Amino acid sequence: NRGVYGDYAIVKVPEGQLATAWEVNRTYVDTDVLVSLTKLKSHVSAGISGGLKNLFGIPPSSLYGDDLKDNPDERAVGYRNGTMHECNRAPLTSVRTFTGKGVPGDHGYNVPHFIVDLAAAFRVDLAVIDGISTIQTAEGWWNGSMVSLTRPGLLIAGRNPVCTDAVAAAVMGFDPDAADRTWPFVNGLNHLALARRRGLGENRIKNLEVGGVGIEAARFEYQPTFRRIGA
């Protein structure tokens, strides 16, 4: 949320599709380097969750959270389901920041577009994906028995989050340039391809230089989080 700062910063989104700006903690504009550190896992709305999807944590619950009513609240800690997944309510920002082009109820459309709008506004300098010990078939503890613990024993890092996430997807056994609404993006759009088309990085493995042990040696087959939205 706002933290020690007296106000929020407004960060514009170049060529924003669902968001024209983000109202966020001032740390994100005062910092010299932005590192996205996340776990290697699949995701029901985004297909995979890597350095890009990790940016979903930037918009503060105090303005975007589900536990808000009519006014911003610095005590809020809720998810952003209504504003950024369902698109059935606007955030309580000081200026209008959303375009209104989200599709109500369609996580698979809204989440990928918001991921790219976040990536366009907050340029990641280093993406680190922890696949040493992680989970698959679900996003987190809140999914209960759907979660499967797994130990790929991998650490994936890169200077561009689109490229890094593409390598992560390939290591997981997925095609990072797969068509929309196919594995692993079965419930929606391929946000890696959306990011490439916005000029944010490359998601086609043939165009990437990969160091370390290489994709084939590192491959650890994942099960996609295939639960249909609403099921």
Model regions and ranges:
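Extended, low-polarity segments enriched in aliphatic/aromatic residues
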Residues: 1-231
